[in-house]
């Protein structure tokens, strides 16, 4: 009997611990994020201004745990997929966080071809379930 209680306790602890970073913040059906002012195939010049659109949810700063909200992340020349969707989005030059609730960014991109994608993160920078992600677009910077 003690063995059964120990196993049940361990399973419950694992379930609670795993839920903390499991990417389980729900996104409402039909929620979407998109680029407002650029599209796939565009040729751009520096400085590049990118505007972020969001439908079906609200924008809130990182750390604000409020239902149906999140904040933007701009993914440059990278992908977020598989198990990465259950983890906080990295913060580096390819994964730009807008934890203050920003909906626009002006930046310098090196000349050449780049892929861009928007991913909405929850209060703790983890993508929602299901993930709210734009289509990945390809742009050329002159």
Whereabouts are the PLM-identified features?
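Internal, hydrophobic beta-strand segments that form the core of beta-sheet-rich folds
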Residues: 109-125, 133-137
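Contiguous beta-strand segments within globular domains
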Residues: 42-57
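Short, well-structured beta-strand segments within conserved domains
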Residues: 48-52, 103, 112-120
């Amino acid at each position: 009997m003690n063995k059964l209680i120990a196993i049940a306790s361990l399973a419950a602890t694992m379930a609670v611990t795993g839920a903390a970073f499991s990417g389980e913040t729900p996104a409402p059906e039909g929620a979407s994020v998109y680029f407002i002012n650029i599209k796939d195939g565009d040729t751009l010049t520096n400085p590049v201004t990118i505007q972020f659109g969001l439908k079906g949810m609200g924008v809130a700063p990182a750390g604000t745990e409020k239902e149906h909200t999140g904040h933007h992340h701009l993914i440059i020349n990278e992908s977020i997929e598989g198990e990465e969707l259950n983890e906080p989005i990295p913060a580096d030059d390819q994964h730009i966080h807008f934890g203050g609730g920003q909906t626009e960014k002006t930046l310098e991109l090196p000349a050449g071809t780049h892929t861009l994608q928007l991913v909405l993160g929850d209060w703790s920078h983890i993508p929602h379930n299901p993930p709210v992600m734009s289509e990945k677009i390809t742009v050329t910077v002159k």
